[in-house]
Amino acid sequence: MDLPLLAYKPTTQNHRVASFGIADQNEDTPYIYRLEDAASYSEIREVIWACYRQVFSEHATLAFNRQITLESQLVNRVITVRDFIRGLAKSERFYNTVVAVNDNYRLVDVCLRRFLGRSAYNEEEKIAWSIKIGTLGFYGFVDALLDSEEYTNAFGDFTVPYQRKRMEGRPFNLVTPRYGFEYRDKVGTTKTDWRFTLEKFYDRKFQERRLPEGDPRKYRDLAAAIAPKTRYAQQLRAADIDYLAKVPRRR
C-alpha cells in the first residue's frame, strides 16, 4: 500500500534563497553540467563522468561502477540525464555499495544530498522518507525523489544534480561516505580504509572520543607495556626441608 508522504516543515537552507549576489560566484560554486551544452562526444563524456561522481561520490570513476548500456543510450540521446541518474541509482553496484550498508535514515540523508543537492531538513523529513522506503522499497523511493517537483524545478531532465548554494562547509562527497558509523565500526573499516584517514578527524564521534591533555587514560597503554619485576612468597613446605643435610658437620 502506497502511503502518502508525511508532512514535515522545511528549515532554512541556502538553496532556498534565490540569490546571494556576488557571493554566488565564488570558487566553491560547482560547475553545472547540462546535456544541452554538450555539443561534442568529449563533452557528453564529461556529463557522464559528472553523473558518476554525483551518484557514487567517487573522485575517480571505477570500472566496475560503469553502466555501459546506459552510457550508450545517453550518448545517442535516447534517454535524459534524469533517466541516467535513475539507472545508476537502481544499479546493482549502487545497491551493494551504498544501500546494503546503511540503515534507512542514513540512506535518506545520502540520497537527498546526491540526488536533490541538499541535506535533510530535519529528523521529521528523514522519518517521512524512510517510511516511503519501507512501503515502496528503495527503487520506489528513487522514483519518488527523481519525479518530485523539487527535482524537476532544480535540475529538470538535462542537468546533472549538484550541491546547491554551497557557501561554506565541506562538500557533500566528503561528509557522506558510503559507510555509516555503525557499519564502519562493525566491520572495522575505520582503521583500514584510506577514505577515513582524514575524515575521522572531523567526525563528532571521533572528536568526543579524543582525550584531553593530562587525562590519565591517555597513558593506559604505556602503563600496560611496563612489566615490573615481582617477588612472590616462597612456596616451600616445612616437611620438604632436609634439616639433617643442612646441619654442619666436622670433617
UniProtKB/Swiss-Prot annotation:
Compartments reported by the entry: Cellular thylakoid membrane
Major place of residence: membrane
Limits of the PBS-linker domain: 11-191
Family matches, as Pfam families: PBS_linker_poly
BP terms from Gene Ontology: photosynthesis
Entry keywords, A to Z: Antenna complex, Membrane, Photosynthesis, Phycobilisome, Thylakoid
Gene Ontology CC, one term: phycobilisome
Taxonomic superkingdom: Bacteria
Topology in membrane: Peripheral membrane protein
Complex formation: The phycobilisome is a hemidiscoidal structure that is composed of two distinct substructures: a core complex and a number of rods radiating from the core.
Function: Rod-core linker protein required for attachment of phycocyanin to allophycocyanin in cores of phycobilisomes. Linker polypeptides determine the state of aggregation and the location of the disk-shaped phycobiliprotein units within the phycobilisome and modulate their spectroscopic properties in order to mediate a directed and optimal energy transfer.
Family indicated by similarity: Belongs to the phycobilisome linker protein family.
Protein name: Phycobilisome rod-core linker polypeptide CpcG4
Organism: Thermosynechococcus vestitus (strain NIES-2133 / IAM M-273 / BP-1)
Organism lineage string: Bacteria, Bacillati, Cyanobacteriota, Cyanophyceae, Acaryochloridales
